[in-house]
Amino acid sequence: MIAANKPPAFGLGPIHNCYGCCGYGRGPYHKKKLNSRTDQLHLICGSCYLPKENKEKPLGEDAHFICHDAQTIGVADGVGGWARKGVDAGEYARGLMNHAKKTATGITRSSAAAVDPRKVLSEAYANNAGVQGSSTACILSLDKERGTLHAVNVGDSGFMVFRDNMCFFKSSTQQRSFNCPYQLGNCVGGDCPEAAEEFEVEELRPGDIIVLGTDGLLDNIFASEIEEVIVAYDVSGQDCEELASYIANRALYNSLDKYNVSPFQMEAQKAGREHVGGKIDDITVVVARVLASTKNKNKNIYKKLSIERNTGTTTRAYSLKFQFHIGERHKAFDVPCQNAFLRYTFSCFRNSANLAKRFLECAT
C-alpha cells in the first residue's frame, strides 16, 4: 500500500462533488436486500490479528475494534508509505479505532437508536486529528430492529456477508490507482469521512456470517476460499474468534505462497504490473455471526447467551451467562468453564409444571 499523492482535500485544491472523489463530496451508496425476516437480531463477534514480522513495528499497522453494546465493529489499516518519513501509520490507525469505539459506546449510552457508522467515522476522524499519518477504515453497525447492516468504507478494507456457506454480498474498494487506496488523514492528499462509500445490507437473518477485514485479508483470499473455511468449520458453533483465526491463517498461508494465484496478483496484472503469489501484509479479520433475539419477554422461554473471555498466557477462561425469562419471572445462571476450547449444546424446555431445565455439555 502506498500513500496517495493527490491534491489536498481540505480546501487547498478544487472541491469534488462527484461520488467517490477526494474532498467534500459524499461517497456512493450501495444497497442490497437479502431475504425477509421477522425476529430482532443481534451480533456476536470475534477477531484475529496477525501482524507481519517487523521488529521495529511489532504491533503492525492494522487496528480494529468490537463494541458489542453498540453492535458496531471496525477495522483500519495505516498506510505504510509513511514509514519513509519516519512515521508509524499504525499509531494513526489505532487512534482512529480507539476513538471510533468510544464514539459508538457514547451513542449507545445516550440513545436507543441504531448507531450510524458514518457519524462514528466522522467523530473518530475529528478526534484523531492530532496524530500524524493516514489510514483506511471500514465500520459496520447492525440495526437490530430493522435487521439491516449499515457500513461505511474508505480505502481497500471491506466486508462480505455469507449465507448458507455462500457469499451473498461483497463490498467494493476505493482506490485511485493500483495499490493506492483512499485514506483518511490530515495530510496533503488525505481524504475526509464524506468521501466514504456507504453500504446497506437489508433483511439479514439468523445464521448469516459477516467477515470484515483489511487488505491483508482481501488481497490474499477469495470469497470462495472463505466459503470453504466456513464449510469446514462447524457452523453450528458460535465461536467467532476461532472462525476468524481459521480465515486469517488461511490468508496468511496464501500470502507466503509464491505460487498461489491471489486476488492481489490478479489486480496487479489488470494494472499491467508484474506480481506472482500472495502479498505479505498485516492481516485483520473480524467475524460477526447474526443471531435472533426475542422481542417479547412474555414468551414462555427466552434465552440469552454471552461468552466472556480473558486470554491468559496458556489457557482461556470462559464464563457462560444464561438468562431465562419464564413468564414474568427472571433467573440467571453463571456456569464457569476452564476448557481451552469449548463446545456446548444448550437446550431448555417447559414441562407441565412450568419448569425450565438446562443441559450443558463441555468437551476439551
Place the predicted regions along the sequence by residue.
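PP2C/PPM-type serine/threonine phosphatase catalytic domain
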Residues: 1-364
